[in-house]
Amino acid sequence: MRTFLLSLLVTLTWSGCQPSDPALLHVDLPCSVRSLDVLGPEHVRFAGSNGWVGQTLDGGATWDMAQWMAPDGTHPSFRASGHSSNHWHAVGIASPAWIARTSTTSMAPEWTYHNTDSAMFLDAMVWMDGNRALVFGDATGGCFTLLITQDGGAHWERVPCDLLPAPWEGEAAFAASNGNLACQGDTVWIFTGGLASRCLRSVDAGRTWTSIDLPVVQGSSMTGVFSATFRNARHGWAMGGNWEVPEDNEGNLAVTNDGGTTWQMLAEGRGPGYRSSIVHHPTQPRSLVATGFDGLDVSFDGGHSWAHHSDSSHYVARFSPDGRTLWLAGAKRLTRLDWPLQ
């Protein structure tokens, strides 16, 4: 196993000419990034394509990056990640599927899961607490892939098929922003798309599941929910749309006020079009950000109305725990914006 390390070999661009402007940081990357984890006010990690991972401990002023090579000599394409009590974890999406972890501030990988099934495609990871997590993937052999760990990611087991809802014809999930898995305590939501788009909900940490049909656009391979965010166990938003018709802004944003039992459409024909990532502000309950390759949009009223902030292309958005910073990542770029956005 070889790991290539880079320290500070990134291009940093600061802008903001007036004191009232937001501090703006752009970082040029050697990879595409669809998964971001903000571990603290200044600590951010990303998981990217071709084995690339990186972190900053000082709010983006300096970066360490590494290109992880798996034991079989491949560089996994990482599109999902998350952190437990003592480790950060990255998920390689396709066959051979790999999961690796490293200590919270380290860059050296430990490989904890491997699967060579040619149909394997892992989409997202979510941590329920410091020891328990789920990884969701597309169906193989007529059964969704759901991996679970209860020891901080040291070991992973596949949940038996008879405990999961059966996939519908043409139903899958999107590894677009590590956004189609969400949790609040032991309540977990999985969002699917394609020919069918559903919410799969568990209230007992993944032991039993119920299926809820969604009112969002669906019926073709690149439609449905791409990302969801919950501010508590009852209130959440699910967003996506039609990747092939990104300007279509109907049927792409739904809200629940009862923990996912029912969903209603929001901002029909008035909000942004296709977006791959939606996140809520950690301290402002009605503030939302949605981003995608067509731009960045903001709502301050729970998603009923939206303002287009910029045409800047990103795949994933994450807030810092204190809500003072918004991090964005996409194709060979990473951006930091101060909140509130200007």
Predicted features by range, described:
Residues 1-4:
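Positively charged n-region of N-terminal signal peptides that target proteins for export
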Residues 8-21:
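Bacterial Sec-dependent signal peptides at the C-terminal "C-region" and cleavage site
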Residues 19-342:
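Residue-level hotspots at or immediately adjacent to binding/recognition sites across diverse folds
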